[in-house]
Swiss-Prot record:
Record-linked SMART domains: SET, SRA
YDG domain boundaries: 1-132
Residues reported in the UniProt entry to bind Zn(2+): 250, 300, 302, 307
All residue ranges annotated as the Post-SET domain in the record: 296-312
Boundaries of every SET domain copy: 126-290
Protein's gene: SUVH10
This protein's record includes keyword Repeat: no
The species this protein was found in: Arabidopsis thaliana
Biological process per Gene Ontology, one example term: chromatin organization
PANTHER family to which the protein is assigned, alphabetical: HISTONE-LYSINE N-METHYLTRANSFERASE SETMAR
Family listed: Belongs to the class V-like SAM-binding methyltransferase superfamily. Histone-lysine methyltransferase family. Suvar3-9 subfamily.
Protein's recorded name: Putative inactive histone-lysine N-methyltransferase family member SUVH10
Pfam families: SAD_SRA (PF02182), SET (PF00856)
GO cellular component: chromosome, centromeric region; nucleus
InterPro entries: H3K9_HMTase_SUVAR3-9, PUA-like_sf, SET_dom, SET_dom_sf, SRA-YDG_sf, SRA_YDG
Amino acid sequence: MGLVGLHSGTIDMEFIGVEDHGDEEGKQIAVSVISSGKNADKTEDPDSLIFTGFGGTDMYHGQPCNQKLERLNIPLEAAFRKKSIVRVVRCMKDEKRTNGNIYIYDGTYMITNRWEEEGQNGFIVFKFKLVREPDQKPAFGIWKSIQNWRNGLSIRPGLILEDLSNGAENLKVCLVNEVDKENGPALFRYVTSLIHEVINNIPSMVDRCACGRRSCGSKHVFREKLSVSSSLVISAKKSGNVARFMNHSCSPNVFWQSIAREQNGLWCLYIGFFAMKHIPPLTELRYDYGKSRGGGKKMCLCRTKKCCGSFG
């Protein structure tokens, strides 16, 4: 976080100095906090959080006491009084690692309230309520939604099938429709790999020898133009996988690439999809269908700013 300038402090709060000649206690103001869920922080709400002040604990085997408006609590108090924007990073435990954490940047917040209350140890602690600024893309909210779906605490909106692959994939492929009332696709066979006819003729650049059949004659991994005499058509009408449901877009976020791969001494054709840019969680994957040799134009429904109105 320090490398990207998000949070450079070694503690759960970062502050900067400000010029305020009329307020001696306002020379430092909080600009970033990390809510780790410790110190009685309340972090379950995706649009707000309760941040506990600093001090008054026996973290270093000292005597517990009431928290005071001093040291690290002063920058938080200054941000509250001046209604200054504060960056918030949510810290969550990584379930895949014993001592690992996951940090989620959740945008900018504003401290809207500050009060004192009795803590779990019987001493007074400071509480700061931070509310997320409007018109920001969800971050921690998406994380919490996914957790609730996995744990069965809530149902994903528009969910039709929990696993379209019926266990064929390592990860479940959820079928979701948030656009219309269509209940699901027509009957088809879910496959995890492309069912194709083997390309019997090895490309001319590969020597026709045992060495060539082991792929050491050519070092090309991706091959856009294949030396194939007949046209190739990939149809997902009767069988396919998750790529079967990827829609067209005039502003795609993935692109397709043909791949020629040696398998058991023979060349086979595959299609791979690659990200064109950063894709946030729960974002629909779309690619440009391109131009077809026949069939005419079809109406485009991508509704992006660069929509051409038709494709094909």
